A protein has these predicted regions:
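Small beta-barrel nucleic-acid-binding modules, primarily SNase/OB-fold domains
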Residues: 1-137
Length: 137
């Protein structure tokens, strides 16, 4: 059973959504286990669009893992049984997050996407989002 069921009101980027509780409160949710390219990076728009396709305006299941320094909930996000983090990693539109413990499944999804040159892995040397932002992972 999920910790929360919320309605997605906005997809900010590939790994961040805004969702609304039944009482009208909104929550910024960072997708656990991945780091998607920033919208200003190659494949950032593709990651955002895929996130919209998977969770846009859906009621999603939120399994809270943590909160970050910005006050966002760090959570597994699923819509209709589809895990957003795993889907982005499998399509080659996210790295597994180095700063948080990540499931072995997400690491495997990234490894397979790299091996099969999917998404951002078609680039010779893609810049991870944490380097693009100038932060450590």
């Amino acid at each position: 059973m999920p910790d929360l069921r919320l309605k997605v009101t906005r997809v900010k980027d590939g790994d961040t959504i805004v969702a609304e509780a039944q009482n009208g409160d909104t929550v910024d949710v960072r997708v656990w286990g991945i780091d998607a390219p920033e919208t200003s990076q190659p494949y950032g728009t593709a990651a955002t669009n895929l996130a919209r396709d998977v969770v846009g305006e859906e009621v999603v299941d939120i399994d809270v893992m943590d909160t970050d320094r910005y006050g966002r909930v760090i959570a597994r996000v699923q819509a209709n049984g589809t895990d957003l983090g795993r889907t982005l990693a499998r399509r080659g539109l996210a790295w597994h997050a180095r700063r948080y413990p990540t499931s072995s499944t997400i690491k495997e999804q990234e490894r397979d996407a790299r091996a099969e040159a999917r998404g951002l892995w078609t680039q010779d040397d893609p810049t991870p989002p944490w380097e693009h932002r100038g932060t450590s992972a």
